[in-house]
Amino acid sequence: MTQDEMKKAAGWAALEYVEVGSIVGVGTGSTVNHFIDALATMKDDIKGAVSSSVASTEKLKELGIEVFDCNDVAGLDVYVDGADEINGLNEMIKGGGAALTREKIVAAISDKFICIVDNTKQVDILGEFPLPVEVIPMARSYVARELVKLGGDPAYREGVVTDNGNMILDVHNMKITNAKELEDKINALPGVVTVGLFAHRGADVLLVGAPDGVKKFV
């Protein structure tokens, strides 16, 4: 299996968690795009989706799936999204696609978080993938200095504006041994919208596309 074939396998495997008549939370990224393709095969059996990004919204609509505003739903049964890294506790780094804030919001209103990845995303310790932090533009330099104090090496992601109109700092050289504590510390910095650590709201189910098929971790 190629890496993309493993992503596709994980994306299609998530379809079993979608309930008939439901509104489905949909994340962002290359693996999620495969899930959206799968979801389109049962578009007549679901009410629609809540999307975490403009890109996913466009793809959902192109495939004929109705997209609801997050503010118009009280909650979701399931949220399906990928990850840039995920550890053995199902804690994740997300935000490589700059949609981390909206992803956190949709995850927060969902009863179950299904994470879909290929096997290259599984790690023992989070941090080799740069940790994204969404910041309000005027706070960029201040937040960067504070991230250095926390042991990181932040870099401004050039040319990227989030769907919320903000900037991304990617924090390199972090070995994250206490993800919940670091999530709290970074989120407490004035000017931070959110950090791409999904530790307090980790995945409930992990579906991993591997050369020998899809593996499930709970």
Swiss-Prot record:
* Pathway named in the protein's UniProt entry: Carbohydrate degradation; pentose phosphate pathway; D-ribose 5-phosphate from D-ribulose 5-phosphate (non-oxidative stage): step 1/1
Q: Which Pfam families match?
A: Rib_5-P_isom_A
- Which parts of the chain span the membrane according to its record? none
Q: Which UniProt keywords apply?
A: Isomerase
The UniProt entry's GO biological process terms, in alphabetical order, are: D-ribose metabolic process; pentose-phosphate shunt, non-oxidative branch
> Which reaction equations make up its catalytic activity?
aldehydo-D-ribose 5-phosphate = D-ribulose 5-phosphate
What are its E.C. numbers? 5.3.1.6
Task: Tell me if Metal-binding is a UniProt keyword of this record.
Answer: no
Q: Which GO terms describe its cellular component?
A: cytosol
Give the residues the record marks as binding substrate: T28, G29, S30, T31, D81, G82, A83, D84, K94, G95, G96, G97, K121
Q: Is tRNA-binding there in the keyword field?
A: no
- Annotated active site: E103 (proton acceptor)
Q: Which top-level enzyme class is recorded in the Swiss-Prot or TrEMBL entry?
A: isomerase
Q: Tell me the GO molecular function terms.
A: ribose-5-phosphate isomerase activity
The record's family statement is: Belongs to the ribose 5-phosphate isomerase family.
Function recorded in the entry: Catalyzes the reversible conversion of ribose-5-phosphate to ribulose 5-phosphate.
Q: How does it assemble?
A: Homodimer.
Q: What is this protein called?
A: Ribose-5-phosphate isomerase A
Q: Which organism is it from?
A: Aliivibrio salmonicida (strain LFI1238)
Name the gene for this chain. rpiA
